Design a protein with these regions (language model features):
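Recognition helix of helix-turn-helix/homeodomain-like DNA-binding domains
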Residues: 69-85, 110, 141-156
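Short, charged recognition helix plus adjacent turn
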Residues: 17, 22, 106-129, 134-137, ...
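Short hydrophobic transmembrane-like helices used for membrane targeting/insertion
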Residues: 1-5, 9-11, 15-16, 32
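A detector for short, charged/polar N-terminal pre-domain segments
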Residues: 25-45, 103-115
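DNA major-groove recognition helix of helix-turn-helix/homeodomain DNA-binding modules
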Residues: 89-104, 157-166
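Conserved hydrophobic/aromatic packing and binding residues within compact polymer-binding modules
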Residues: 50, 64-65, 75-78, 105, ...
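Short basic helix-loop element that most often maps to the first helix and adjoining turn
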Residues: 48-67, 119-134
Length: 166
């Protein structure tokens, strides 16, 4: 609003609007992506979920990497298809940053790892009332490999998980 009093002009705002401008840096890419997926629950790939949340927060990959303390190239690989394993500590930081439960970011395989692969393998073996040796023979793997899985010394590969536990 503008008013003139004794040849002196005074200006005062009628309304002050304050809102964050959240627009992704690559607007067209984000627009196409958001048309494909309107909600992260529709996605099965972790890469898509990470990209969706990053676009929602209008961040660059390098900004996300800086916030969670990893190399930008590492984070770029997280958003590429074909990656099987995502370190839990990085996913926990991302979940905290986006204020979502970590389970909503993970796929079935990474949830298997997150919920203690060793315990799950042991429970499945014990539910079938098998010894480690018998269970290893059933799966067609060495006894040492099964022991390492059960004690969380070695991470089971996704291809193995799909073959035996999916």
């Amino acid at each position: 609003m503008i008013r003139n009093i004794s040849y002196k002009i005074e200006v005062s705002p009628l309304i002050i609007l304050h809102f964050p401008l959240l627009a992704p840096r690559k607007f067209l890419d984000a627009q196409i992506f958001n048309l494909r997926f309107s909600d992260p629950s529709e996605m099965t790939q972790i890469a898509d979920k990470l990209r969706w949340y990053r676009y929602r927060h209008a961040l660059l990959q390098s900004e996300v990497a800086g916030r969670i303390g990893i190399d930008p190239k590492t984070y770029m690989r997280y958003e590429e298809y074909g990656r099987d394993y995502y370190p839990i500590e990085h996913m926990q930081k991302l979940a905290g940053m986006y204020v979502v439960p970590i389970e909503s970011l993970l796929d079935d395989y990474n949830l298997f790892l997150y919920h203690d692969q060793g315990r799950q393998i042991r429970e499945r073996r014990l539910s079938q009332k098998l010894t480690q040796k018998a269970y290893a023979a059933n799966l067609g793997v060495s006894l040492d490999k099964l022991k390492n899985w059960e004690e969380n010394r070695v991470r089971m590969f996704k291809s193995t998980w799909e073959k035996y536990f999916r």
